[in-house]
Amino acid sequence: MSNEVKTKEKVDMDPKYIIKLTVTLFLTCMVVAGILGWVNSITKDKIAAITWEKTVAAMQQVITADDFSDAMELTDDMTAAAAAQGGTLDAVYETRSGGQVVGYAINVEASGSQGIISMMVGIDTDGAVTGVSIVPNAETSGIGSKVMGNEPLANGTGVLDQFIGKSAADGTLAVGTNVDAITGATVSSKGVTTGVNTALAAAGAIG
């Protein structure tokens, strides 16, 4: 056996060498993990800030206020009331002006013709709708998108604007009864209506 092979075997079996290698690998992993954690922390904060800016922008479209709180904790009563209307309650934000609560911005989801419609619904302290805003969606271009884009109805009122002022006192909102639909976009109109009913129910369950 050559001296080179003997030396290699000696190095491979040397406990000090193994310990040194183990420590080196451990420290390297720790440094890499630390760097990745730092980068992730910075990225996470930036993503959270951008998401919050978009959320506030959506809330500003549906209710007038100068202060928007973080999402409230959803209660069982709120989620149950929302589910009973056929939609899904995602988040509820309390809104204030001059330090006084002026209403809520409620993020809900409902089924549309091409998938889930996510929307923000503003509701004042009297329980009346102050506005409806649709989050980017997959509704059909030219038909469902007319509803999403708040296109005017025959009477000139925007299809989303028609919900403003409506409340639980009007009973369950329904297309053909107390809600109008754009011709050819009935499914999308029903989806938005379900979302508004869901938001109204959730608001009514806020303690």
Give the ranges of each region predicted by the language model.
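Flexible, solvent-exposed loop/hinge segments and secondary-structure transition points
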Residues: 2-207
